[in-house]
Structure formats: C-alpha cells, structure tokens
Amino acid sequence: MTGVHIKDDSIDTTHGCILYIEGVTVSFDGFKALNDLNLYIDDGELRCIIGPNGAGKTTMMDVITGKTRPDKGAVFFGQNHDLTKMNEYEISHAGIGRKFQKPTVFQNHTVFENLELALHTRKDVWQTLTRSLTRVQIDTIEKDMETIGLKDQKNLRAGLLSHGQKQWLEIGMLLVQDPRLLLI
C-alpha cells in the first residue's frame, strides 16, 4: 500500500463506525499495556479517553496511527481499511490526524508558514520552489487561524508563541489537512 491516499468517499461507514478496535493486546517485555481492548467510535462522534499514567492511552493512539503494532486484535478505519497493515505515512494520508503531547511546530517559521507547510500539497523540490498558494488554500489557512485563535499572530515566528499557542498551532496544522478522524 505504499503511497496510498484514501479518498474520503472510500471510507465505508455504512454501519456508523469510523474507528473499530477489537481484541487489541499490546505487550512490552511481558507487561500488557493494552489487554483485549475494544473501542468503537461512530462517524462524527466526540470521544474522550481518560485514565491515569500507564493506563494505555498513548499506546492505544500509537496502535491507531501505526507507530506500535498490536500483538493481536483488529483495528479498522471505516469498515475496509485495516490499519494494522498500513504504515504511519499511509495512515496519516488516509485521513487520521494525531496531536502529540509536546507541540511539534517549525520554530523559525511564522504561524502562516507552519499552516502552509502542513497543507496536503506536492512537496517535491520543483513544486516547493515554483508554486504559489491558491485562493482556496489561503482561505483555508485564514479560516483555521481564526478557529485556533492565532489570526493576530499570523506573521509571528512560532518559536515566539507561548506553549499553549504552540499547542493550538499544531492543532491548526492538523485541521488544514482536513482529517476524517482527529486524535488529540
């Protein structure tokens, strides 16, 4: 499945589920970080996963995004995309976005440039040197800056933002990619 980009309409949610996790177990040196986890998230549903340190929240997100492979169990995006058979790149391009605990932004670039870099565009050398943003792309970035509350910081370098603003910028970097499933 290298180079896969799943079109939104190919994600089959006819039975409601956008994320299907069943019987997932993950062990690290004999310690079961996840033990027979079952989780079903419906399309459009907001779900909060809470628990103490070591409860398996990060491990679960690592399994969903392909960073960690389960010892057993099934993980599907929609009904027809087996995430256990996809790599991290394929999963992110399939429409799953993930926000990490520590913000990862380009410190020496402006807020606008960070959002521009996050857009789904061709990133080869020629395109990077010669392309300019379309009106739709600029509007998308400006709308997302408004959503994340950083419109007034548009031209400010990300390294000068507060920690909380960097968190919002990273969320904005996910939003401009228009993910079908967002893990925060």
Language-model features, listed with the residues they occupy:
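Catalytic Walker B motif of ABC-type/P-loop ATPase nucleotide-binding domains
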Residues: 182-184
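ABC-family P-loop ATPase nucleotide-binding domain
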Residues: 1-25
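Conserved ABC ATPase "signature" region
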Residues: 128-153
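The feature captures the beta-strand-to-loop junction immediately N-terminal to the Walker
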Residues: 50-52
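Conserved ABC nucleotide-binding domain
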Residues: 84-85, 144-162
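ABC ATPase NBD Q-loop/coupling interface
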Residues: 74-93, 133
